[in-house]
Amino acid sequence: MITSNTSFLALIGNPVSHSLSPIMQNAAIKYLGLDLIYIAIPCKNEDLEIVVNSLKKMNCKGLNITIPFKKKVFDLCSEISPVAKKIQAINTLKLKNDNNWSGTNTDIEGFIYPLKNLNLTNKNSIILGSGGAARSVIQGLIDLKLSKITIISRNNNSLNELITLFKNDIKIEGILNTNDEIGNLIEETDLIVNTTPIGMSQTSDNDAIPFGQSSWETIDSNTIVYDLIYNPSPTPFLKFCDRKGCMTIDGTQMLIAQGAKSLSFWTNGLEVPFEVMHDALKKYL
């Protein structure tokens, strides 16, 4: 029951109407018997500082931060975790006792979650896309001790940024999606991760495959293919790779695992029920 004493957690971004976070977070909150509620708050670019600082004065305990604010909230935090500093992205804020925000990033642990029991040490990986999501993926693959990462992208500037950021941590290279060597790379890689929005329900490319179907005809059936998109599930890309005999992973487990880690962060280490969150999403979708 919501009362005047009920605290709240919120997702801040633009847009947030498509987010499934309130569904899974409120299911976990109810299961744990917490006097909390989780809501999504749309925020314009120019209003970010006002909104985030105003929430300090309300009964807000923590925030999730999504596109396009994961870097912009740095200046609003008095404390930032080393991992968030490293990848230059914050997705979770917690209000400290001194009424200032502490920022961290749970996307990396979320990304790793479905890969933890696979032996990827010294394996090679291809990452599709060089946007913000690629940073968490690269750090996750470093943590899993892969030996080499190749990023395929349409944007040379963002490719170079990522290589500069991570070149001291792992063997990493970037190539443009027009490179003739892509077919050979795909044939030889162990893990492919799609971080692009191609295939997402809300995009005009919702029936498309990253860089075109012809790029993937040579994919080996032993390759693991991981698409960060969770709606639709599976994506056209995963359907294609599944028909090729590949092991496929969608973005649902990452979504839940990063959300569970955020809720644990807000509640000082409380064990959060993954399955309860998963069942809530499954029922909704």
Curated annotation (Swiss-Prot):
It holds the Pfam family SDH_C. Homodimer. Pathway: Metabolic intermediate biosynthesis; chorismate biosynthesis; chorismate from D-erythrose 4-phosphate and phosphoenolpyruvate: step 4/7. Involved in the biosynthesis of the chorismate, which leads to the biosynthesis of aromatic amino acids. Catalyzes the reversible NADPH linked reduction of 3-dehydroshikimate (DHSA) to yield shikimate (SA). This is Shikimate dehydrogenase (NADP(+)). InterPro entries: Aminoacid_DH-like_N_sf, NAD(P)-bd_dom_sf, SDH_C, Shikimate_DH, Shikimate_DH-bd_N, Shikimate_DH_fam. SUPFAM superfamilies: Aminoacid dehydrogenase-like, N-terminal domain, NAD(P)-binding Rossmann-fold domains. Its EC number is 1.1.1.25. PANTHER family: BIFUNCTIONAL 3-DEHYDROQUINATE DEHYDRATASE_SHIKIMATE DEHYDROGENASE, CHLOROPLASTIC, SHIKIMATE DEHYDROGENASE. One of its GO terms (molecular function) is NADP binding. It comes from Prochlorococcus marinus (strain MIT 9515). The gene is aroE.
